[in-house]
């Protein structure tokens, strides 16, 4: 079976993380969120997959390659325009990206599944496809029920008694919502869908294609299913998803490392004596770390790979990226460290280079685009004025 993963967006809502990596490469416990989606496809027999790319496309292509490590075949559709002999990234919209693939090779010659690359799900895709085929429809959107108090966060799908889609509401007020079923970004199509998608123009599935299907009264259905869905569309989602996994709110997500004590996981080649540290679970200390005696780590917390945590430092309710040295007197609470940034859970952003007691290990010779520094430091220099270093104790 065939599928497509949408990965061409600029990741505007997840800046500054997306300055360094595309949104589908955001790591959850060290693994890109899109890797889990590819593994789910493989599990359910979807082994021929096209990924559309644009923003920082090379990071995605270099990581996943041809897909053989995941027992699938991967191909990439790069969306760009040529300017003065050079390609400049230019996404075509989710439906436009589908049309580009179809015009190029006729790839979609059977029922196919399309998903967004920035979410983790445990949906039974085989069952979803069976529901789609039972309706005999042209398109099916997979929905999920949320509490009425949460509908204002999502796109709401309204159906008739036959499950045919009749309208959409974009983030309605609770009092105005006509349904509590939300769009999860999981779609099933027949090849005839391309009769509704124009060629060589930007065209979006949600805002362009679906309203057109409703207007023309096409056979367009919604199937409501019960499954876990973790979206990392915004900066705060990265920490919230990580925290939920550590706190046991997510079933089935693999936690890396060996559990040395209840709620304390430690990776290989790590130097730590948990009896001599002050550790309050749940905590993950990744591979290759050095945690000195006396260090305090209060969960939920994740220490990335190859980090050093000195004896008099404290970490609480925090996600730390790879290759970070927390010197004595570092006091990091309610933060996410990512690339060159210290991101507060309240939206505060600061360059790590401007923080005392935090050192980025610059002399590493690795090629990991996930959680360490990127190769685009020239961009960072334009993002914030130079300032005197601020002790982390003073960071809000």
Please describe what each predicted stretch is.
Residues 258-390:
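Structural signal for interior beta-strand "rungs" in well-ordered beta-sheet cores
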């Amino acid at each position: 079976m065939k599928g497509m993963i949408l990965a061409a967006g600029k990741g505007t809502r997840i800046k500054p993380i997306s300055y360094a990596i595309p949104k589908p490469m955001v790591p959850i416990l060290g693994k890109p969120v899109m890797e889990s989606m590819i593994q789910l496809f493989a599990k359910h027999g979807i082994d021929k997959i096209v990924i559309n790319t644009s923003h920082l496309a090379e990071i995605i292509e270099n990581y996943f390659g041809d897909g053989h490590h995941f027992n699938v075949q991967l191909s990439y559709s790069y969306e760009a325009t040529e300017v003065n002999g050079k390609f400049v990234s230019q996404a075509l919209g989710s439906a436009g990206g589908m049309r580009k693939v179809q015009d190029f090779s006729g790839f979609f010659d059977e029922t196919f599944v399309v998903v967004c690359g920035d979410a983790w799900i445990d949906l039974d895709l085989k069952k979803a496809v069976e529901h789609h085929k039972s309706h005999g429809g042209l398109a099916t959107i997979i929905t999920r029920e949320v509490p009425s108090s949460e509908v204002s966060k999502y796109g709401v799908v309204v159906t008739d008694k036959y499950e045919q889609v009749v309208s959409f509401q974009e983030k309605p007020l609770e009092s105005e919502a006509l349904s509590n079923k939300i769009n999860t970004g999981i779609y099933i199509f027949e090849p005839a869908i391309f009769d509704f998608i124009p060629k060589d123009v930007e065209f979006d599935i949600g805002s362009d294609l679906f309203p057109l299907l409703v207007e023309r009264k096409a056979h367009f259905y919604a199937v409501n299913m019960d499954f876990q869905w973790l979206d990392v569309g915004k900066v705060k989602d990265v920490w919230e998803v990580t925290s939920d996994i550590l706190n046991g709110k997510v079933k089935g997500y693999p936690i890396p490392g060996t559990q040395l004590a209840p709620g304390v996981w430690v990776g290989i080649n790590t130097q730590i004596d948990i009896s001599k540290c002050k550790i309050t679970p749940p905590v993950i200390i990744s591979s290759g770390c050095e945690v000195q005696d006396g260090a305090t780590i209060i969960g939920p917390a994740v220490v990335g790979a190859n980090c050093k945590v000195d004896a008099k430092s404290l970490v609480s309710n925090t996600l730390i990226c790879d290759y970070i040295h927390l010197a004595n007197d570092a006091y990091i609470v309610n933060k996410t460290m990512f690339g060159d940034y210290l991101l507060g859970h309240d939206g505060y952003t600061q360059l790590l280079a401007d923080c005392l007691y935090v050192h980025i290990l610059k002399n590493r010779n690795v090629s990991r685009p996930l959680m360490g520094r990127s190769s685009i430091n020239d961009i960072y220099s334009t993002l914030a004025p130079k300032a005197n270093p601020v002790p982390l104790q003073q960071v809000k």
